[in-house]
From Swiss-Prot:
InterPro entries: Paramyx_V_Zn-bd (IPR024279). This is Non-structural protein V. The keyword Lipid metabolism does not apply. Transmembrane segments: none annotated. The lineage of its organism: Viruses, Riboviria, Orthornavirae, Negarnaviricota, Haploviricotina.
Length: 282
């Protein structure tokens, strides 16, 4: 934007503000008829005094006239402010697009009034050098990216950054978190169904084989090892090396009691001689 355009816009704004100020003064003069009318050179103090005079006169005259005049004054002030804002919005300069792509996108939709052509002309002017020579290379590259509309009613197609020959996007396969392998949707559903069946509630009554497979044999507690005459599937005996160890033998003769090494069974695992050892001396 040149300096001359900035100065012109500023002058238009000032003119709009002065016009709004004069209109507000005329509205105040219409309300204050008995006293001397206010002019454009009135100070803010004089305007405030006039407003105070109106308020005191309304209080003496009655509440009805006061409400009517206040509503009228409020409407006039609001209308004046709306007019000022409307004029100021009209006088404000419009922002120009900085890049050639933005200006091209804004002007690629031609209208009967020729707005699209004006946009293209402004685009060429923006690409011109300071000496007046136009930069035809930049303008041609920008204009090449603009796609013309097929019909006047149909909207223009946006610039596509993908080639027409590209294949459509395909849903990627999901990765299984447990196995670390890439599985398809069907495999994932089958795996979920199998897990659901595995975690279903089992029956409380189990057979002997099921109990053996499901629950392991509990290890003995230290206080149970000290009980005498308690039948278990294990026994604490003295080994030939003189070490008190845990041995597994016939439950009928497996009595937990510390015995000296001379009283060990023939098999070397039972505290006393049992029927099994007598029948099978080996």
């Amino acid at each position: 934007m040149n300096n001359t355009e900035i100065i012109e816009n500023a002058s238009k704004v000032l003119e709009a503000i002065d016009a709004a100020k004069e209109e507000e003064l005329r509205n105040l003069n219409s309300l204050v008829q008995p006293r001397a009318p206010l002019n454009a050179g009135s100070t803010p103090g004089e305007i405030i005094n006039e407003i105070k005079h109106l308020s005191t006169r309304d209080q003496e005259g009655g509440t009805s006239s006061k409400d009517e005049e206040e509503s009228g004054a409020g409407r006039t002030v609001a209308e004046g402010a709306a007019t000022r804002d409307h004029k100021y919005s009209k006088s404000r300069p419009k922002k120009q697009p900085r890049s050639g792509l933005q200006s091209g996108a804004a002007g690629k939709n031609p209208t009967p009034d020729g707005e699209g052509g004006d946009t293209c002309n402004r685009e060429l002017d923006q690409h011109s050098d300071g000496d007046g020579h136009s930069n035809t290379e930049g303008a041609s590259s920008d204009l090449a990216s603009i796609q013309p509309c097929q019909t006047d009613d149909a909207p223009c197609s946006s610039t596509s950054y993908l080639d027409e020959e590209d294949e459509p996007a395909v849903r990627p396969k999901t990765q299984c978190k447990q196995s670390g392998l890439i599985e398809s949707k069907e495999d994932e559903d089958g795996m979920l169904s199998e897990l659901h069946e595995q975690h279903k509630g089992r029956s409380k009554r189990l057979s002997a084989l099921g109990r053996v497979n499901s629950s392991p044999i509990p290890s003995p507690r230290p206080d149970e090892l000290l009980k005498k005459g308690h039948r278990r599937e294990y026994s604490m005996v003295w080994s030939n090396d003189g070490v008190f160890i845990e041995s597994w033998c016939n439950p009928m003769c497996a009595r937990i009691r510390p015995l000296p090494i001379r009283e060990i069974c023939v098999c070397g695992r039972c505290p006393l001689k049992c029927s099994k050892c007598l029948l099978d001396p080996e």
